């Protein structure tokens, strides 16, 4: 069996590693570098250029150069090049093909299998898209693993006998994740995860780029962002300045001939201090603090419980980021892992776990958001709670909401709001062919199954007929830039409102069910119930129906209580009547048994008498 490689498919840069002699080794690319820019370009003749060469030619070919495609994974985004549309999966596959070829050149053998990392907060469709990109690139993706979890493997492989809690802060080029893990006895267990799929180093570049562009516009009256070539030069200069400011206090930006007017060429010369950069990007650093606090809260830990802080991603080299993390955790981050390479190293270790090369290591990851379905009244019914360890399988039985309902619509959702409308729709499917029956009678078993890749499969089965429908969620989540990050925050802000609305729907459903059951019982027990008592129940039922129309929770609750009180006496009498009928039937059967015994004894006597006569 060939080697299984570990790939960190990043927004800005990608990296690949493999286990050699039980130790993870980062594979250099064909240019001799340990990371590869996640950039794809198309030359004049349609030639495909990937990695460092693509990044180098971006200034002269901005329209046919694609960067940060990872931010569009799982969406219907298209890149139009030379009258052809490319999906994010297509572009990502080109990067993966380059990585695959470099790995094959290094190993001297064909590579067919890989473990690929994704941000912990990637949705189901984004994970599926990553797996599809691997398939397009000719790779059998053995496992999708979360980036912070991979980083923890890189950190803790030689510390499996130690018991500690670690916080992984992963700020990449386009995504941000934070995960809390517990490490001990070879088990890497994720306790909680949080993040933002649309926050990363690119946003820091953009903030600095906008500041420089506005300053130039104020001075020269020209907006450099309107010219694609000037914009690309400005972007590269901003990225370089950001990197320099991690180790120096000032960075000089010099872009001669950045643009031209009738008066002649214009040059851009500007000094950026670290304090100015920190001021420009302070809101971005602060955006990472919320998910960090939420992850600690979800894990049931305080900052003092954390033993080690692991920083992952090139953007964590920014001093302001390190200071912000230290401010919350009251400790310096661990410097023992390479933030650019540790995710790929962790992926290679996971590959070794899958092949059996690495033993006594167990990885327990979690799902970042709750999963469930929409039920009567638009309520979101959770089947799998957020931060549940995966793989996980959970079933729950539901029923029909109307008499003779021939089909049920299963609407699959992801999020933290109590009402379905406040969550993300992942997809829907229909289970049809349900035999005619009163509502509440059919038993529909809905099963959610999340595999180790975090990909969701949902099935619905009619337990009466055995009919079943399944769906693998592949639909785009269609989320705007900050929707996923806002899910839990929105849930907290709207918790009371959602709780009241959910209670109202549940009480209304309870009332409807009670009316249905009692009216059914009255009809089936006609002639067995005292007319006066039946009249009392009917009157209370009418009051309950009016209370439901009023939509006031307290009125509905009181009406339900009143109906139950009046109906209790009738149900008691019906129970006693049924018990008496059963007792009478039992006595009748006992009488029949006695007659049979008597006949048997008489026959025996006759035979005995006959023998005596002989």
UniProtKB/Swiss-Prot annotation:
Signal peptide boundaries: none
Keywords: ATP-binding, Chaperone, Nucleotide-binding, Phosphoprotein, Stress response
Pfam families: HSP70
Phosphothreonine found at: 175
Keyword Heme on entry: no
Residue stretches of biased makeup (Low complexity): 579-589
Gene: dnaK
Domain of life: Bacteria
Organism: Alkaliphilus metalliredigens (strain QYMF)
Expression triggers: By stress conditions e.g. heat shock.
Name this protein carries in UniProt: Chaperone protein DnaK
Family (UniProt): Belongs to the heat shock protein 70 family.
Chain residue ranges for the region called Disordered: 579-614
Functional note: Acts as a chaperone.
GO MF annotation, one: ATP binding
UniProt xrefs under Gene3D superfamilies: 1.20.1270.10, 3.30.30.30, 3.30.420.40, Actin, Chain A, domain 4, Substrate Binding Domain Of DNAk, Chain A, domain 1
Regions annotated as coiled coil: none
High-level lineage: Bacteria, Bacillati, Bacillota, Clostridia, Peptostreptococcales
InterPro entries tied to this protein: ATPase_NBD (IPR043129), Chaperone_DnaK (IPR012725), Heat_shock_70_CS (IPR018181), HSP70_C_sf (IPR029048), HSP70_peptide-bd_sf (IPR029047), Hsp_70_fam (IPR013126)
Biased composition (Acidic residues): 590-614
